[in-house]
Amino acid sequence: MATFDDFMKLDIRVGTITDARVFAKARKPAYQLQVDFGGELGVKRSSAQITEQYKPEELIGKQVLAVVNFPPRQIADFMSEVLVLGTYSEGGVVLIRPDKDVKNGDKLG
C-alpha cells in the first residue's frame, strides 16, 4: 500500500502543451508532446497514449498535469521526460487538467 509520504515524493506540475505530433515509431498509438512548465522547468517532452480522445491540433494550448520528477524514458527514438496524467475511460485516456487557467509550473497541492 502506498503511503502519504510516497505521494509527496511525486512532483506534479501544471504545464501548457505547445506542440503535439503523431508518434509514428511508437508501438502503441501515441503523440509526442512538448509541454511548457514555465521558468524553473522550461519545456519538457512527453510521449502520451491519448490518440483515442484527442487530435494533435486540439491539444495545443491545453493545460495538463504531469509528473516531472520521474527519470527520462527512451521510447523508440524519443526521450520522454515527463508523465502527462490522465484517467482511463471507455473511450480512451482523458487528460487531467485544471478547471481554470493557472501559471505554468504550479505544483499540485
Q: What do the predicted segments below correspond to?
A:
Residues M1-G109:
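Phosphate-backbone binding interfaces of nucleic-acid-interacting proteins
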